[in-house]
């Protein structure tokens, strides 16, 4: 219950974004929803794990533009060797953004056509380019950790604390290594963040939408968009930083 299902981001040119992810990350289309005013496309590696997460691209047909904000940080994708993976992307034509040497040799970053940051991390598990984590910035670490652990039963399985910031990684108890985690970044200087609208939501999956919603309401999660308001197909709550969390069914 509550496994991370996907991360949604909004794109201004669907064809350009699909071409980018399919060309450079070898992603394939896993699902598509064509509505009158928008299109949602779900992407992931061919051999994504059953408990792995997908990337959802949302394209609104009215040609709107988006602001990135700074409350969302990045998605991270897996590879065996960060230097080899970065060189592969550079040779294929991806723009040079933050190479491994500029990141201490342990990770790197590129950006997609809309400017969403994508971290490249070394892992000994999961399909190449599969989603490892999604990073979000939080204004109160204790409150955010408490929300994800109490509302979603997540475990804090990794923490890194530095002089001026800290990183906390959470995902469901007993989740496989291949499952995506959420990374909470907390800066000690008390700064505030803007959500923007280039990022949409995190989605968690459950077996029973209505039972899950009742559990969340019993744990005093925000009643934002209940199942009935979403045609009993999904629902939305929000975390303490007003970030949307979608609930979907397996």
Regions found by a protein language model. Give the residues of each.
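Active-site/binding-pocket entry motifs
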Residues: 49, 62-64, 175-176, 189-191
